[in-house]
């Protein structure tokens, strides 16, 4: 068990390499073209700043300068 105390990080690296290999294999199975063709429509975004959208303090382009 002394070797486990010294070389525990090697087991962690082997585990992480295994996870990365499985992620890569799973991502290769994803058909992104099929997903993009059947992509669901997103609902419109609603923010809570809409009450300030009307009273915008940016100058209008059509207004003459004072």
From Swiss-Prot:
Region Disordered: start-end pairs: 39-66
Pfam families recorded: UPF0370
Biased composition (Basic and acidic residues): 42-51
Residue stretches spanning the membrane: 4-24
UniProt-annotated location(s): Cell membrane
Keyword field: Cell membrane, Membrane, Transmembrane, Transmembrane helix
Keyword Membrane in record: yes
Membrane topology: Single-pass membrane protein
Similarity section: Belongs to the UPF0370 family.
Protein name: UPF0370 protein CKO_00315
Organism: Citrobacter koseri (strain ATCC BAA-895 / CDC 4225-83 / SGSC4696)
